[in-house]
Structure formats: structure tokens, C-alpha cells
């Protein structure tokens, strides 16, 4: 039907006859001449109909979002009427004929006025929202990114192999989406949270290098950057080590950013241990564009009478830190400090102590804070020296249980960095490595990543003889600008070590056999050393397109309650369907 997209129309086509198709983006009547901006996925082109044209009445009857096909001759725009904002802005099409393919009702919101439209309305009419050039750009970028990744992995010997969606329910940290079986009454499939076990089994099968662009599902409470169904770049390889995965993935991600948005990353990426990341930034996914670091002052506060600091300073499970904000005296108002105090409270902090450094030559008198009177001058100036604080700086303090301090002050660091625009560069990719194998909660061990991550031991004897809480894993996360974009590990490839890890996690031999028997069996039939990584496509596209809303980069996303406002899913099903599956719905008690 068409000969050209809108973006193809330029001065090189002057005098040529073209056919375009698209939506009426805007209609204007200037002195009896009809000007139409026609929109397709590539942009806009101006179509002009003069009153003496046989199709003038049709052009005059058009309204926003009508779908049309038009023929005409490309002409240079009159001098001074060029539009530098669009690729076809030097030319216009003098219309010969026009056909209305379909009319449109008045749309529920104007495409140019989307910011004043509630997100619920945009999600209900998602097919309208997706007509916006900004939204189309994000999904086109997504398509280009996935194409680049496929080409890179294909060219590096990885095989695209599909794994099942209907599989066995296994615990991986979040709730499974369950699918009832009609053939096996009372039994259920689970939608995969990841293809983890299947990709490991492909390594046992000898495929050596695997990848898949795959949907995954998690029935969990949603955050702003989470969806119940999400897309992974899933990768696994055999006879490799951490260095192979990290160097290969650096090349892939660096190439992806250069190809899609023209950004060049220096390689190799910075590598930071988990312990250093927590110690300096309170987070295992630090945003290194922000030049603020924690300074440990635990030892300095141990002998002070100020219990708010000395209590945690003498508790092995706690920490006391200072965070210097250069020029913070002028940049942070009393109102902002009060807001930050409320902010850290979200993470369990009981308060937010601070000191303003007005004058270093006046001793205590040059320091402004409610806490100054409670701390000796010697200790105060030790802290000032440790933090390299200068006049005009402000110090924030975190004191308490280590997790609360890390979470609250890590979040505060990120917030202040954004509020004060402290970013010293545009991009900061890094690897975080040497994660603990386990984390403890309610006196029980949990896998920091997942139960198939290899510990840094060479035998089951080493595993048995090491305190589980002191074990490191062979895991690695890629972090860009404070987002964990990918996570992976070298896997356990020996059956005895895998069985022992299950045991340490409180999974009995019988339970392990019932849930993971097929995997344990596979490990006994000659399993190579193998490892891999998975990248969240959605988060990568968020970074590539500069959005903070994950729903912007998914064509048909769910809300934060995991519902689809457009299709009204989830929905009830007929009693006949439920009976066929042997399911009875229990009514919610009120």
C-alpha cells in the first residue's frame, strides 16, 4: 500500500510520486489549504491539499487519529517554513488522492497531553498510549537491543535453545504461578521463575553454550521496577570460569550500549567485592556516579558517653558510620534534613544525626548540631579528620544494627546524590563479586543467590569443615548506575556438594529427592564445570531509554497489583472449567 515511511521522505525525493499510510496526527486549515501531519512509527510528514483538488472535501473531513492512505508529489517547503524537529521537515507532499481506511472516535486522551493523564487511563487504553512517539521509541530500542544480543551470542558460539514453560514447582525465593493439570487431578505445573535447572541440564547434555530470550514469572509483591512476568537474557556455558563469563558479558553489554545509544564503556569494568560495596556504600548495587562514601567511625565512638553512638559501637552486630556531604551547609535546608530523617525511618532508622561544619578554627563552637554537646571535642575532630571534612560540609551519621544502617544510609546516599545532582559521570558499570554463600534470617540459612551457586570450596570436606556463615560463593552481579542488570555464578557440578548445600539450607534428603531428584541424578552422570548469568531485559531497556518506570519498556505491562486494566485479567472462569480441573474456589472471608 505504501511506497515510503514518513522518515524516508526527504529532499532527495523532490518531484517524485509517493504513497504514505498512517494516522492523522494533526489537521490545520490555513486560508483554505488543508495541512495534515501524518504519523507512522518512524515519525511525521506533512501532507498538503489545495482547494482545487478533487479530494479536498475528504481531506477537510479528516480528524485526529483517522487512518489514511495518501498519494502525492514530494515538494520542497517554502523558505522559512521548514520544520527542523522532524526528519522530513524540509519537504511536504502535495496531495493528489487520499483514502480513509478507518475513522476514529475521539480518543480518551490527547497524545500531546499524556502527562496530565493518569496511568490507569493510559494502561486501560494501552494501544492508544503506544501510539506516542516516546513509547514507540522505547519499544523500537528494545527490539534493536534484543537483535544485537542475539547476533552477539550467535557469533560467539551460543545456541538458542527453548526450555519448558510448564514445569515442576521448586522453591526459588518467590511464589510460583501455578497451572492446574486436567489430566492429573490435584496436581499442578509451575510457570518458571527462571530456566535455571533446564539450562544446567543442557550443560550436562553437552551443548556447551546456551542462551535464550525468555519470559519468567514470579508471584511476588511488586515494586516500581518489578513485573509478575519479565524477560531475561539467559546464558550458560561449560568448561569456563568467572573470568570467561565476566569478560564475554562485558563485551556484550559494552557493544549493546554503543550500538543502541552510542555510549562507550571502558573495559574491563571495575570489580568490587560484596564486602567492600557494603562497607563503603551500604548496598551490593552501588551507584558509583555518586562520589559519596561511608566512613567507619565505630572504634572512635566506643568510649563516648553518648549511648546513641557508643551502644552500637560496642555491639558486634552493629556499625557506626559518617557520610560527608561536600558543601552541605548551603545545599541542605532544615526542611530537607527533616525530610531525610523521615526517609531513613522507612528503613528502620530511629533518627538521623548530623553536624554542620561552620568553622574548624573555633573548635566545638564552630560545629552546629544537637549532638555536639554529647561528644568529646577530641572524638569530633578525629571524625572530621577521618572524613576529610572541610568548612561548609555537613556530616550525616548512621548508628545501629548493621542491616538497618546499610539499608537506610545507602538509600540516603543515593537520594542525596539525585537531589543535589552530584553525579560525576553518566555511566558507572561494575561487577560485584565474592558474595556470601548464605544469609541468615530467623536462625535459618538461606541461599544468597540460589541453591545451585557453587561455594568457594573444592570438596565436600571443605564445605563441611567451614562455618556456613563464612562461606563465599562464586557469584557475580553486573551493576550499572545503581541497578543490578545481571546476576550469575559458577554452578555446583558435583552431586555430593549439591546434596550438602541442600542440607545446610534445611532441605532434608527426602525433600531434596522429591523436589530436585532429577537434578541430583543428572549430576551423577558426568557434569562439566559450568556457569552462567541472566540479564533483565526490562531493566536494561530502562537504562538505555532513560526511564525510571519499567512499564514504559513493556508493550502490555501489568499494574503493581499484577492486573491488566486493558483485558481485565485476571478474571473469573466458569464453574464448568473449574469442575473439569477439580478446583473449588474458597470465598474470601470478610
Swiss-Prot record:
Positions bound to ATP: 218-220, 227, 484, 536-539
Compartments reported by the entry: Cytoplasm
Protein family (similarity comment): Belongs to the class-II aminoacyl-tRNA synthetase family. Type 1 subfamily.
GO molecular function: aspartate-tRNA ligase activity; aspartate-tRNA(Asn) ligase activity; ATP binding; nucleic acid binding
Protein biosynthesis listed as a keyword: yes
Example GO biological process: aspartyl-tRNA aminoacylation
EC number: 6.1.1.23
Entry GO CC: cytoplasm
InterPro entries assigned: Aa-tRNA-synt_II, aa-tRNA-synth_II, aa-tRNA-synth_II/BPL/LPL, Asp-tRNA-ligase_1, Asp-tRNA-ligase_1_N, Asp/Asn-tRNA-synth_IIb, AspRS_core, GAD-like_sf
Start and end residues of each stretch annotated as Aspartate: 196-199
Keyword vocabulary terms for this entry: Aminoacyl-tRNA synthetase, ATP-binding, Cytoplasm, Ligase, Nucleotide-binding, Protein biosynthesis
PANTHER family per the UniProt record, alphabetical: ASPARTATE--TRNA LIGASE, MITOCHONDRIAL (PTHR22594:SF5), ASPARTYL/LYSYL-TRNA SYNTHETASE (PTHR22594)
Protein name: Aspartate--tRNA(Asp/Asn) ligase
Protein's job: Aspartyl-tRNA synthetase with relaxed tRNA specificity since it is able to aspartylate not only its cognate tRNA(Asp) but also tRNA(Asn). Reaction proceeds in two steps: L-aspartate is first activated by ATP to form Asp-AMP and then transferred to the acceptor end of tRNA(Asp/Asn).
Binding-site list for L-aspartate: 172, 218, 449, 491
Taxonomy of the source species: Bacteria, Pseudomonadati, Pseudomonadota, Gammaproteobacteria, Thiotrichales
